[in-house]
Amino acid sequence: MTHALPKVVKSQLVQDIGVALILGSIAGCFFKYGVDKKKQRERVAFYEKYDKEDL
């Protein structure tokens, strides 16, 4: 007689890990591209300030 509990635990772990990977990937991409856009805006503003100044 085999117990169903190990199968349930295994399937739940696989499901939890899958959900964590999906949510982690989405959050990671959002953070990466959000931070890159912020740095790019800061860089553009920085150089625009120097372009307006007379040297």
From Swiss-Prot:
The chain crosses the membrane at residues 13-35. Its EC number is 7.1.1.9. It comes from the Eukaryota. Gene3D superfamilies: Mitochondrial cytochrome c oxidase subunit VIc/VIIs (4.10.93.10). GO terms for molecular function: cytochrome-c oxidase activity. Signal peptide: none annotated. It catalyses: 4 Fe(II)-[cytochrome c] + O2 + 8 H(+)(in) = 4 Fe(III)-[cytochrome c] + 2 H2O + 4 H(+)(out). It is found in: Mitochondrion inner membrane. The keyword Zinc-finger does not apply. GO terms for biological process: mitochondrial electron transport, cytochrome c to oxygen; response to hypoxia. InterPro entries: Cox7e/7s, Cytochrome_c_oxidase_VIc/VIIs, Cytochrome_c_oxidase_VIc_sf. Disulfide bonds: none annotated. Slime mold cytochrome c oxidase consists of at least seven different polypeptides species, subunits I, II, III, IV, V, VI, and VIIe/s in order of MW. This protein is one of the nuclear-coded polypeptide chains of cytochrome c oxidase, the terminal oxidase in mitochondrial electron transport. PANTHER family: CYTOCHROME C OXIDASE SUBUNIT 6C (PTHR28264:SF1), CYTOCHROME C OXIDASE SUBUNIT 7A (PTHR28264). This is Cytochrome c oxidase subunit 7s. It comes from Dictyostelium discoideum (Social amoeba). The gene is cxgS.
